[in-house]
Design a protein with these regions (language model features):
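Substrate-binding pocket helix/loop in short-chain dehydrogenase/reductase
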Residues: 60-62, 68-70
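Catalytic loop of short-chain dehydrogenase/reductase
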Residues: 98-123, 129, 133-137, 151
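Conserved NAD(P)H cofactor-binding loop of Rossmann-fold oxidoreductase domains
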Residues: 52-58
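A short, exposed helix-loop element centered on a Lys and neighboring polar residues
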Residues: 84-85, 129
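C-terminal helical subdomain
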Residues: 137-149, 162-207
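Active-site loop of short-chain dehydrogenase/reductase
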Residues: 17-18, 45-46, 91-104, 137-140
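The beta1-alpha1 cofactor-binding region of Rossmann-like NAD(H)/NADP(H)-dependent oxidoreductases
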Residues: 2-3, 23-34, 66
Length: 207
C-alpha cells in the first residue's frame, strides 16, 4: 500500500537516508517481474531482498473457506516464490546476493485455529530451505528468520493499545530497527559462517 509507505519514506529521508517506495500486488506474477526490473533499472543492483508479507488469520478448520486458505497461501508462499525466483535471476550472473524470508513460529509448528497460516508459513520455510541449498554454491545467501512476537508498528499500536502499553513498560515489544539490525547482520556474514535460520523474540515471549 503506497499510502502506508509514505510516512515511513518521509521519516527515513528526514533522518538523512535515501528511500524509494513502491506498491504492488505481490501475488501477481507480471507485477513482481516488472517491479524487480524497475528497481534494477531505476535504482541499481538488488543486493538484498526481504520478503515479509503475510496474513495471520484464525479460524477453525470448518470456518476456513477455500478462499481464505488460498489467499493466505498466496500472500505468504506464492508471493515469496515469485520474489525469490525473480531476484535470483538477477543475482546468479553476479554470483552474490542475499534473500531473506520472514517467518513465524507457525513456520515450524501448527496450532489449533491456524491451519491456513501454519500451512502457508511452513511451505514458505520449505521454499527458503530448498533455495538456500540450491543457491549457496552460486554465491547467494538465502535465510529464513522466525519473528516471534508483537512488533512496535502503527498498526499494532492502534489495534492493541493496552497490550502495547504494558509490553513497552518491560521492553517486551519488538522494535523494527532491532529486527532490521539482525537482517543486516545476516547479509554481512562471511561465506564460511552463513546462517540459514534465526529466531527473534522478546525476552518475555513464551515459546
Amino acid at each position: 500500500n503506497g499510502d502506508q509507505l509514505s510516512p515511513l519514506k518521509k521519516e527515513i529521508e528526514k533522518n538523512g537516508g535515501k528511500c524509494f517506495a513502491y506498491s504492488l500486488d505481490a501475488r501477481k506474477e507480471e507485477d513482481v517481474i516488472n517491479f524487480i526490473n524497475k528497481i534494477e533499472t531505476e535504482i541499481g543492483e538488488i543486493n538484498v531482498a526481504v520478503y515479509n508479507i503475510g496474513a495471520n488469520i484464525r479460524f477453525n478448520i470448518l470456518e476456513t473457506t477455500s478462499k481464505k486458505y488460498y489467499k493466505v497461501w498466496e500472500m505468504a508462499t506464492f508471493g515469496a516464490f515469485l520474489m525469490g525466483r525473480e531476484v535470483t535471476r538477477k543475482m546468479i550472473p553476479r554470483k552474490k546476493g542475499t534473500i531473506i524470508f520472514t517467518g513465524a513460529t507457525a513456520s515450524i509448528r501448527g496450532k489449533e485455529g491456524f491451519a491456513a497460516f501454519s500451512g502457508a508459513k511452513q511451505a514458505k520455510r520449505a521454499l527458503a530451505q530448498s533455495m538456500a541449498k540450491e543457491l549457496a554454491p552460486k554465491g547467494i545467501h538465502v535465510a529464513h528468520v522466525i519473528v516471534d512476537g508483537a512488533i512496535d508498528t502503527p498498526w499494532v499500536n492502534k489495534l492493541f493499545p493496552e497490550y502495547v502499553k504494558e509490553k513497552k513498560k518491560i521492553d517486551g515489544l519488538m522494535k523494527p530497527d532491532d529486527i532490521a539490525q539482525n537482517y543486516l547482520m545476516i547479509h554481512n556474514q562471511p561465506k564460511n559462517a552463513w546462517t540459514f535460520e534465526l529466531d527473534l523474540r522478546p525476552w518475555v515471549e513464551t515459546w
